[in-house]
Every structure is written in structure tokens, then in C-alpha cells.
Amino acid sequence: MKNYFSCLFLASCFMACSEPQNLKGNVSFSEAEEEVKMSEIITDYSLIKLETKGKNLILDVSMMRIWDDRIYILDAFASDKTVWVFDMEGKHIGRLGAFGQGPGEYIMPRALMVDEANDRILVKDVARNRLLFYDAEPLECVKEMDIPFYSDCVESLGENKLIWYVGSGCANQGDFQKHIQITDMNLNVLNNFISRMDFPRRGLYNVMSYFHRYDDDIYFHHPFSDEIYVYDAENDTVVNEYTVSFEDSKF
């Protein structure tokens, strides 16, 4: 677990820089308990049956967001790739945009985020490297913006900020090669972290996002790395929080 006293002391001693602070602990799978009860990690749950019929059948729940009593589901692998919208009872409300190249449309949607401050839903179109902004009510596109760099995934930080993960294979130049880019909602770069790393192993993997939200924190890691990072919003920096140890375990 985190050592809060160490974190606070070190945070006061260092200025934010382009390389992550190293405060990591070790997460060992060999020391993990063999059995974890679901009741210990899930305390509140419900079953919602989605109204899927006719033209709103879902092939794949690629990504899901729940905001303001609505459920947004990105189906990135259907023939007519789209974002479906349901209420909390499962009733079908509509869709965000549509597959195509016209205004408010996308070709390869690969990210779905909520901009809580402005009550908007954001969709990243990988094919055109563009970010689309939709009003939650009504479900209309209000603007589209070209992204100034290539990235693997993106997540909202709140406070009108976005965090982007730039993979080693992205054809960027200069500071855009750094793995973490922080931008505002107008896609102006505010900061960047972690110099480019070439991972020794290659392969195909279907991961929609490297970002994971826990409470108010954003954690991230690459599938081929044993390092887990967290974005420290208060100090606007990246912290190397954990190292995952499989020891003698094999995949």
C-alpha cells in the first residue's frame, strides 16, 4: 500500500519534471491470498437488461461509461461502429454520431470519455486522428478537433484536462514522443512525461485503454511492462507507484 508520509515528504522536495518520480512499492503475486471473496471488493451492484432490438444490437461492449443516469456503450467492432445510449433502466435512448466521414461522424472510434465539467461525451476517431465532442443533451456533436500527435489511448482527468498515452510505435517527433501527454480540452499540450521506451517483446493485443481509474486517481501501464504509474494531479507529475512481480510464475 502507499506510504503517505513518504509520498508527502518527497512531493514537497521535488519539482514536477519530465521523468516520473520513483516511489514504487512491490506487488508480489506469490504473496497474494489464494481466495478473494467478491463481497470484499464489490458492495453495491445491480443487473440492468439493455433494450437491444432491431438496429441497436450490440456486437461488442468495447468501452462503457455511466454518467448522469445514462449508460454510454462504445461498440468498436460492429460493421456500423457507434456509441449507444441507454438510461439506467436499460431503455434505448439513441446514439452518439454515426459511422461515416461527415460532420459528427467517425470511422474507427477507439476511446469514450466523459467531460463532466461541460456535460459532454468525447469520442476519439483513430482513423482521422480526431476528437469529437457531443453534448449529453441533446445527443449532438458540437465540435471536432484534429489531435496534434498520435496516441494509443486517452482519458479525462477532470478540470478540463486530458491524459494521453503515446506508444513507442507512434510516428511523433520531439516531446510528442514522450509516453504521457497532458492537454487541455482545446488540445494544447500542458506537460509531458516519460521518455520513449522500446519494449523487448512484441505482439498483438487488444487493449482499448492503458488507463484505469481508482477513486480519484488515474493509473496506467503498458501491457508489456511491470511498472504501474499514477498521475499526481496536485503536483502535476507522474509517479512510478508499483512494480508487479510474478517471480517464478509463468504466463
How would you label these PLM feature ranges?
Residues G54, G97-G104, D146-D152, R196-R201, ...:
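Short coil/turn segments at the loop-to-beta-strand junctions that recur within blades
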Residues D87-E89, D135-L139, D184-N186, D232-N235:
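Short loop/turn segments that connect beta-strands within beta-propeller blades
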Residues I66-D68, V114-N118, S156-E159, R213-Y214:
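Residue-level detector of Asp-centered blade-edge/turn motifs that repeat once per structural unit
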Residues M15-A16:
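C-terminal motif of bacterial Sec signal peptides marking the signal peptidase cleavage site
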Residues T52-K55, K91-N118:
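Blade-loop segments of beta-propeller domains
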Residues V126-L132, A136-A171, F193-D198:
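Asp-box/WD-like beta-propeller blade repeats and closely related beta-sheet repeat scaffolds
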Residues D60-M63, I107-A111, F149-S156, R202-S209:
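Repeated scaffold domains used in trafficking and secretory/extracellular systems
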Residues E33-I58:
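A short helix->beta-strand "capping" segment at the edge of beta-propeller domains
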